[in-house]
Amino acid sequence: MAPFDPTGYWSSLVTQNWRLRMVPPAKGDYIGIPISAAGKQVADAWNQAKDEAAGALCKAYGAPGLMNLPTHLHITWQDDNTLRVETDYGAQTRVLHFGGWTPPQAHKRSWQGNSVASWALRRGGRVGPPAARYLRITTTDLLSGYLRKNGVPYGENASLLEYVDLFKEPTGRDIIVWTAVVDDPVYLETPYIISSQFRKNADALAWEPTPCSAGW
């Protein structure tokens, strides 16, 4: 049994890095990202028109950066061991597998990769009781893509580790904090940590699926 209920509709709270999340960053703007020399070379050569012509606009909607986009989430249980996370922004779907799931031998790389999830225990201190349980997600088998819409890259060797925590506002509304740790041995000098917040909605009125795009 899940220690907290992540299902429902959620809206992104853009309370940090508003400029970088709400306005397409300029080419060569990789502030805040521990980008390597190889990563800079790729980012500086980025060509938006080339991506558009190739039908590759979803490269910025892969799992490593998806939750940091200004999106709404729709989270449901696909079955007892599979959590489905949909975004209206870019119309992406992530599938989180529980229960010791392993990818099939003939698996393919994709923007969202293959994700294995589990519930973990976060303790309050050495002698205190457990503070909370959180969701831990490990994702591999990613297609190469962008951490931002201006071509800051991650490669197929990148791995993604995520932590999802539930909190309550003073008003009683649920907030989830989704923290992503992107590790790329080629394009990043150190792991890149991104934290995003979502507030639970009472209904689906804000849900509006849109395709991948170069703008916002």
Task: Label the predicted regions.
Residues M1-W216:
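PEST-like low-complexity, intrinsically disordered acidic/proline/serine-rich tracts
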